[in-house]
Amino acid sequence: MLVLAKSSWVRAFFGVVVFCAAAGDVARADQAKTGSQQQPAADAPAAAPAPDKSGYTLFNPTPDSQLRSFAPDRPPKADSATTVDAGHFQYETDLLNYSQTNFGGVTTRLYQAFDPVWKLGLTNWVDFELQFNGYQNLTATDNATGAAVAKASGFGDVFVKSKINLFGNDGGSAALAIIPYVKIPSDAPTISNGVVEGGLIAPFQLQLPHDFGLTLMSEVDALKDAADSGRHANFVDLVNLNHAVPGIKNLSAAIEFFSSVGTDPNTPPIYTFDTALIYLLTPNVQLDAGADFGLNRAAPAVQVFVGLSQRF
């Protein structure tokens, strides 16, 4: 049954990718017909046209001189709306991640090291992504007695994704993408729930005045119920605001409000306030660090991390 479930999830995943790719073609065709979203005033100087990158593919890579600005998904929970350029490879990873949750009379501590996301640009507007949840060590302790409630260690789940940009990949003040995904469970008890899950993510980015960047993201997931083998819908929404740090070149900061609310009565909602610092070491290497803070009991009280991203 698990093999059949995995097969159906994979077929559904690639079906969504094909559908979204077709939608992206329609959106780009409409944009080409109508021109830019806002026509310049008659006396405004004409902007240089963006280079045509539509012909670049995995086997005909985008030249380095035409690469878009480096935009990893990390460090916040929000995903970027732009894809990896065709024929280029990118990885993003936590170097170390620690979280602590106090809920239901139990304190849970989780350490995680190296959870890489590998990305490969397939076309100018589609990339393929594999996310490996790294090695995790979990301990849960009863607050009243100090006794260990649970201990577990092992490697986490694998997420298979495809990011499809609908518009804004190569210029403009707005960008939108859709990201279908499937989760393939690991065999680590407690670390993984052992069930194939999936969903669809939609990040929207907007460039605001005074160099502020805004990301609005919504996500819908089909997840396993906490108490049985049933399924429920889960809804993720977040707002992310970022800006360069004045006086420090290549350093920016981000804040984010995150919510995850499902229809399973045994799965509590999660609300967090997230912060991050991002330093662009080179045009293709990014370092980051951050701290997330729980806004309700079920959320991790604190989560801290440092990470690295690089493009080739």
Residue positions per predicted region:
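N-terminal secretory signal peptides that target proteins for export/translocation
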Residues: 1-9
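Bacterial N-terminal signal peptides
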Residues: 11-22
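Sec/Tat signal peptide C-region and signal peptidase I cleavage site
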Residues: 25-29
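Transmembrane beta-barrel domains of Gram-negative outer membranes and organellar outer membranes
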Residues: 30-312
